[in-house]
């Protein structure tokens, strides 16, 4: 049976994935003068920050100084101005790094993203996924599946902001997946109880008789009750595939239901309810591209200054394992950087990467996967794709000084040191 292409779109830059990185890649490309189309699998923009409920991006400041700016910060500021967040106190050295993350109202932030895409002139198509790609010397033909059928996009450049490097993998470029991926988390909120309503000892005694996974302890259960959410690590492998993602979502709900029913059996917790769950489980790690440059943990934590740095990144190495978190912090006044080469799949002419799957080792990736950094890499990829499209230049041949000029024009920080 012949499959007919229903719609044929053209663009200078096609961005696949309208999540944490992709939405700012599209806005930045459009603001740099490119005709831009943005394809998003969900019904809303924002990805992990909205659909997965991780609505507390960070870190935009390091050692008391703003290190990430531009359209992504404007989106945060507009959300604050609309009453959708309260700006935390910024200090030289906060007691806890997450105190400087900004808790955003998901509804207001999503509306701001839609508005900013409209203002920039981005052509947005939601509820669609990439299904194929063909690359020539001069352009790309990308197939997407819309609700009404298959459509094509002819674009000069493309940005993979899927979080899983799906487009890059389809195009035949090398991606890397660790033997084990970091666990995922389904965001949620529980209510209907107080800490004085139950006996901790009863929880410990009953827990010992239950058949819970070995990575879940009675102390974990008590911690969930203190923070008001079932903050569980869910084993995650192959989240870059439909089958793997399906298995992950099922396991998230099964695990959460088991804990929920256990808690409901405890005297004093009969009225406990899960009153919010995110629309999808938040994935920390899947694929990473093999890039023109690869960020190592040593380079990242020591603030190595690349000759093609495009943004700062300030978050501790934050490797989640099933039974906890392994962290390592920057020394005082040290800030990590992201090189442009880490956004370029090795030997790519027309495709860039933005977000958590940029080229990095597993430990560096555990830090640069966080949301403010993903936003900043999106901005860098958007400007680079727009400039490369305008000058008919391979992405790897783009002049670094021109990229810095474009980033400065959109308000991004470029004074790297």
Question: What is each model feature region?
Answer:
Residues 28, 34-35, 40-132, 185, ...:
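Conserved N-terminal/central alpha/beta ligand/cofactor-binding core
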Residues 14-16, 25, 30:
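Membrane-embedded transmembrane-helix bundle of lipid-linked glycan/lipid transferases
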Residues 48-50, 110, 150-157, 162-417:
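Flavin (FAD/FMN)-binding glycine-rich loop and adjacent Rossmann-like elements that form
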Residues 22:
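N-terminal Rossmann-fold NAD(P) dinucleotide-binding loop
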Residues 7-19:
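Beta1/beta-strand and adjacent pyrophosphate-binding region of the FAD-binding site
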Residues 134-152:
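Conserved beta-strand-loop-beta-strand element in the redox core of flavoprotein oxidoreductases
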């Amino acid at each position: 049976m012949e499959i007919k292409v229903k719609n044929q779109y053209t663009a200078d830059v096609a961005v696949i994935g309208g999540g944490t990185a992709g939405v700012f890649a599209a806005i930045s490309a459009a603001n740099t003068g490119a005709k831009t189309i943005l394809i998003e699998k969900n019904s809303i923009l924002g990805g992990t920050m909205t659909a997965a409920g991780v609505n507390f991006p960070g870190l935009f400041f390091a050692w008391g100084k703003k290190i990430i700016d531009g359209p992504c910060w404007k989106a945060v500021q507009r959300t604050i101005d609309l009453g959708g967040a309260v700006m935390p106190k910024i200090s030289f050295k906060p007691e806890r790094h997450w105190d400087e993350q900004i808790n955003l109202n998901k509804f207001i932030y999503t509306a701001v993203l839609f508005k900013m895409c409209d203002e920039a002139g981005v052509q947005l198509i939601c509820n669609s996924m990439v299904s194929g790609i063909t690359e020539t010397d001069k352009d790309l033909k990308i197939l997407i599946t819309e609700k009404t059928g298959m459509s094509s996009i002819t674009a000069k450049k493309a940005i993979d902001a899927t979080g899983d490097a799906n487009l890059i993998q389809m195009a035949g470029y090398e991606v890397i997946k660790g033997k084990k991926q970091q666990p995922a988390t389904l965001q949620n909120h529980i209510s209907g109880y107080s800490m004085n309503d139950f006996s901790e000892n009863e929880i410990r005694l009953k827990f010992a008789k239950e058949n819970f996974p070995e990575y879940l302890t009675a102390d974990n259960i008590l911690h969930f009750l203190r923070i008001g959410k079932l903050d569980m690590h869910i084993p995650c492998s192959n989240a870059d595939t439909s089958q793997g993602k399906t298995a992950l979502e099922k396991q998230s709900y099964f695990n959460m239901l088991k804990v929920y029913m256990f808690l409901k059996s405890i005297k004093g917790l009969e009225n406990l309810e899960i009153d919010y769950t995110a629309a999808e489980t938040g994935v920390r790690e899947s694929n990473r591209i093999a890039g023109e440059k690869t960020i190592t943990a040593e380079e990242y934590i020591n603030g190595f200054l690349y000759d093609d740095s495009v943004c700062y990144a300030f978050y501790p190495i934050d490797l989640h394992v099933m039974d906890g978190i392994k962290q390592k912090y920057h020394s005082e006044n040290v800030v990590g950087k992201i090189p442009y080469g880490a956004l370029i799949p090795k030997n790519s002419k027309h495709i860039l990467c933005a977000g958590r799957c940029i080229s990095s080792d597993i430990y560096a990736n555990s830090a640069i996967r966080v949301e403010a950094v993903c936003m900043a890499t999106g901005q860098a990829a958007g400007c680079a794709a727009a400039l490369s499209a305008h000058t008919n230049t391979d992405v790897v041949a783009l002049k670094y000084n021109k990229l810095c000029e474009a980033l400065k024009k959109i308000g991004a920080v470029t004074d790297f040191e």
